[in-house]
């Protein structure tokens, strides 16, 4: 019998990535106060990549304490230098994100942790680097207006799988990690655990 797989998230995009790759996983909300946890980590001056990893672990542990099998927790944070970006609260904040990122390179700290029986057993951190072209104010206004509230669900106020591709001059790292799930290393681990065929 194969191990059950649960995604400690209600993220439609992460579930869709897993399903498209042939991984059946239930999505369960981890019920974590992410904002409070992030504020504590930032007050302690943890590097952005460590913040993402700890939040991914917390999500997986919370759900794993109540669910059998393997529980996948994930988190993605955008780092511009040492500064962490959160999902924009509204469209004006999305515009400000884009203004700050314009003409610069940033990293998407994309962490996943797998827990079993309430304890972490596997971790992976992907760090795709994206370079945004210089954006004009007119472009930012038009882009945000046309994409609308969809931009509020991403840390960078862009969706690479759509018109957000127009924002970049260079991308280093794998596509799945940019979308929020380092899928290839995850699939490797699931094969090791015999969740997927080898």
UniProtKB/Swiss-Prot annotation:
Catalytically driven reaction(s): a ribonucleoside 5'-triphosphate + H2O = a ribonucleoside 5'-phosphate + diphosphate + H(+); a 2'-deoxyribonucleoside 5'-triphosphate + H2O = a 2'-deoxyribonucleoside 5'-phosphate + diphosphate + H(+)
Active site residues of this protein: 75 (proton acceptor)
Main location: cytoplasm
Keywords per UniProt: Cytoplasm, Hydrolase, Nucleotide metabolism
InterPro entries linked to this entry: ITPase-like_fam, Maf-like
Entry superkingdom: Bacteria
Family matches, as Pfam families: Maf (PF02545)
GO cellular component labels: cytoplasm
Gene3D superfamilies in the record: 3.90.950.10
Swiss-Prot/TrEMBL cofactor(s): a divalent metal cation
Protein's cellular compartments: Cytoplasm
A single GO BP: nucleotide metabolic process
EC number: 3.6.1.9
GO molecular function: nucleoside triphosphate diphosphatase activity
Task of the protein: Nucleoside triphosphate pyrophosphatase. May have a dual role in cell division arrest and in preventing the incorporation of modified nucleotides into cellular nucleic acids.
Similarity comment text for this entry: Belongs to the Maf family.
Name of this protein: Nucleoside triphosphate pyrophosphatase
Organism name: Hyphomonas neptunium (strain ATCC 15444)
């Amino acid at each position: 019998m194969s191990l059950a797989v649960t995604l400690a998230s209600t993220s439609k995009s992460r579930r869709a990535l897993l399903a498209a790759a042939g991984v059946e996983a239930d999505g369960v909300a981890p019920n974590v106060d992410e904002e409070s946890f992030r504020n504590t980590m930032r007050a302690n001056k943890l590097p952005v990549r460590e913040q993402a990893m700890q939040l991914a672990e917390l999500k997986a542990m919370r759900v794993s304490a109540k669910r059998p099998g393997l529980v996948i927790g994930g988190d993605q944070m955008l780092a511009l230098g040492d500064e962490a970006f959160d999902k924009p609260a509204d469209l004006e904040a999305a515009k400000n994100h884009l203004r700050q990122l314009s003409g610069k390179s940033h990293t998407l700290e994309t962490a996943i942790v797998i827990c079993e029986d309430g304890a972490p057993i596997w971790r992976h951190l992907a760090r795709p680097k994206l370079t945004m072209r210089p954006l004009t104010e007119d472009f930012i206004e038009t882009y945000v207006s046309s994409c609308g509230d969809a931009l509020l669900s991403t840390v960078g106020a862009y969706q690479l799988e759509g018109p957000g591709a127009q924002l970049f001059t260079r991308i280093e790292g794998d596509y799945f990690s940019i979308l929020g799930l380092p899928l290839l290393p995850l699939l490797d681990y699931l094969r090791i655990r015999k969740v997927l065929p080898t």
